[in-house]
Amino acid sequence: MNTVVIVDCLRTPMGRSKGGAFRHQRAEDLSAHLMKGILARNPQVNPKEIEDIYWGCVQQTLEQGFNVARNAALLAGLPIEIGAVTVNRLCGSSMQALHDAARAIMVGDAEICLVGGVEHMGHVPMTHGVDFHPGLSKNVAKAAGMMGLTAEMLGKLHGISRQQQDEFAARSHARAHAATLEGRFKNEILPTEGHAADGTLFTLDYDEVIRPETTVAGLAELRPVFDPANGTVTAGTSSALSDGASAMLVMSEQKAKALGLTIRARIKAMAVAGCDPSIMGYGPVPATHKALKRAGLTMQDMDVVELNEAFAAQSLPCAKDLGLLDMMDDKVNLNGGAIALGHPLGCSGTRISTTLINLMEAKDAKYGLATMCIGLGQGIATIFERP
């Protein structure tokens, strides 16, 4: 089978969903901007050679409906011969898009694919139009459909304290802010047009979601938001609401070499797994174990890890059971995570993979893991290898 490689990866800045810079930009705009941008950065690639576009998106309605991948490709002016499909595995959608593209390349059905994802949570809220089947309650706790309550449950089962959650959240903002100041996001962010508070157009080249002023003491003053009486999960220890898109240029290693492109990473292994929906945030653990087994590697072999921060109460149990708690400052979410940057659902899979690849390059790392939990009880994981 063909070896699948990443030759480039990009993302928009993360915009605040409430009155943020992208409030007048649509999901298709963000997506098309990245599609054009990643091809402009790689002029050796003839767009007509792209077989398919795989684009993750969760709320596929309103501006994100009717196959947003195809809409964005047409908006970007890409050749009409390129196919496009919108992929939905909830929070893992764009990572699933990467897996789908990788398999097409592995078996020879494609040589080049454009991969990514988008979510404009300001325009299309996460709960818009959600209508669970009443019969689900026979098999699944009703609270399993409320992500914050699943985080509360997972945190309680693993003895995660409020203090630990506040410290983890403060770390996320501090690391993301430091990464911004030190220019560590510069290579992965494609400056994107947005609107300032007064409505004037400007180019955003930083993540406006990060709150540099965040402290443990400040977080400790917030009230639990999902279980006000007995809970520990607050808005401050949950992933921020943000708007954004991410993209990757994926191809066979043979094609990359023929085009003279630098191979930034290879896909070493991929996996998905299910878990109890009531503790949906635990999904990264079984998914990671599967991926490691398929790669013939161990957790110790992973030099850098991106664990999507849906909630602090969810991330910490996963880090604990993956044996990462003692390695956090050396390996895990070194540039912060979704608590600081936000979790635009369909965008996050390729967003964390993009951040991971840039970190691997900065640290001259061999192996990296990107993994995330998925609503209703799933996990997804990808292991990358640098050449």
Swiss-Prot record:
This is 3-ketoacyl-CoA thiolase. The active site is at C91 (acyl-thioester intermediate), H343 (proton acceptor), C373 (proton acceptor). GO terms for molecular function: acetyl-CoA C-acyltransferase activity. GO terms for cellular component: cytoplasm. It comes from Vibrio cholerae serotype O1 (strain ATCC 39541 / Classical Ogawa 395 / O395). Pathway: Lipid metabolism; fatty acid beta-oxidation. Its EC number is 2.3.1.16. It catalyses: an acyl-CoA + acetyl-CoA = a 3-oxoacyl-CoA + CoA. Belongs to the thiolase-like superfamily. Thiolase family. Its main location: cytoplasm. Heterotetramer of two alpha chains (FadB) and two beta chains (FadA).
